[in-house]
Design a protein with these regions (language model features):
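Structural signature of tandem alpha-helical TPR/SEL1-like repeats
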Residues: 1-12, 22, 33-46, 56, ...
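Canonical tetratricopeptide repeat
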Residues: 26, 60, 94, 128-131
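Short, structured interface segments that constitute the first stable element of a domain
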Residues: 52-66
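TPR/TPR-like alpha-solenoid helical repeat scaffolds
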Residues: 97-101, 121-133
């Protein structure tokens, strides 16, 4: 199935049942992948309003806020994502990067270390090692 066909199928499913959180998330992921941030943001926010404990929505919404330079909001989303799943290495990485961009290096350090522990062979482990010292 092509991405455009999948998006159409998710839209149709949401017409039939606007509370299908999985369809909202999957459609948001498609928009995010196309760099359609406003559409993706609205869908993630709607999914969170229906099911507040959906990790992926918080993490991806944090990525959107980060991409938009809205670091305080990104930080809040990443913190909530970590509350829901403290073992996802990329959340620690992006929270650390966000804290650094906000001038909060001390706050970033434990997340750099967590990233290294959770993803010892991760693509950003050298960067994390430099910042965590």
């Amino acid at each position: 199935m092509k991405v455009s066909e999948a998006a159409a199928a998710y839209r149709k499913a949401l017409e039939l049942d606007p509370s299908l959180v999985a369809a909202l998330i999957n459609l948001a992921n498609i928009h995010y992948g196309r760099d359609e941030l406003a559409e993706a943001q609205a869908l993630y926010e709607r999914a969170i309003s229906l099911e507040s404990d959906f990790f992926e929505a918080h993490f991806n919404l944090g990525n959107i806020y980060h991409d938009l330079g809205r670091f305080t909001e990104a930080q809040a989303c990443y913190r909530e994502a970590l509350r829901l799943n403290p073992y996802y290495a990329d959340t620690h990485f992006y929270l650390a990067v966000t804290c650094e961009k906000m001038g909060l290096s001390q706050e970033a350090r434990p997340h750099w270390r967590s990233y290294q522990q959770l993803a010892p062979n991760g693509e950003w482990v050298e960067l994390a090692r430099e910042f965590s010292e």
